[in-house]
Structure formats: structure tokens, C-alpha cells
Amino acid sequence: MRTYWTYILASKPRGTLYIGVTNGLIFRVEQHRAGKGSGFTRKYAVRLLVWNEEFASARDAIQREKKLKRYTRAWKINLIERTNPHWVDLYPALPGVAPVPVLVPRGNLDPRPKAEDDS
């Protein structure tokens, strides 16, 4: 069964909002983050996934997107804050998103220059 999503991206808490619909939420958010999504998201640096809703049909997801776009900005902010009051980026918690690797430096971490060998 195919799944569809309506989603809201933000540039920052209570910042610029973008509403979209997709059948591949992870891929689409990654496109937006890489500046390959839409011209709008690229121009306004809208990259935080702050809200999403899952649907079984494309028609239902598109209807929801159209409805959300008609609502006022205040209504949209209220929608986001009811489920995500701190405007946390939801993308890293999506099932299937690879965790960001923790880089462990190798070698000497001492910033002081090495003493020359006087032998």
C-alpha cells in the first residue's frame, strides 16, 4: 500500500512556512534540504519538518494540502504548536532516516605543537 503525506516545513520557529504533499516524505524533505525542492524553499531556507500527516490516498493528501493553504498563518501556527510546541525538526525521527554518524577524531588532539626531538 502506498502512503502519502501532507507536510509543513519552516525556516525557524514561527518563521516562513511551506506546505507540500508527497508520496515519499523522507526523499522530499531531503530534496528541500539540498536546495533541490522548490524555488520557494530554496529562497527562504525552509528546511525544518515541523508537521506532517499521513494519508492512504493521494486525493486525500492533496485535499488536505489545499485546505491548509487556505487557512490563516495564525491557524497554521496553532496546528503546528498543538503537536510540536517547540518546533522541533521532526525529520531525524522519521522511520527510515539514517542516523547522523558521530565522527570520532583520530590521532593527537593536543592543539599544542610537538616539541622537537633534541637527540
Language model: regions and residue ranges:
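A short, polar/charged loop-to-alpha-helix boundary motif
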Residues: 74-80
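GIY-YIG nuclease catalytic motif and its immediate N-terminal context
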Residues: 1-54, 59-66, 83-85, 89-113, ...
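Catalytic/regulatory signature loops of cyclic-dinucleotide turnover enzymes
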Residues: 69
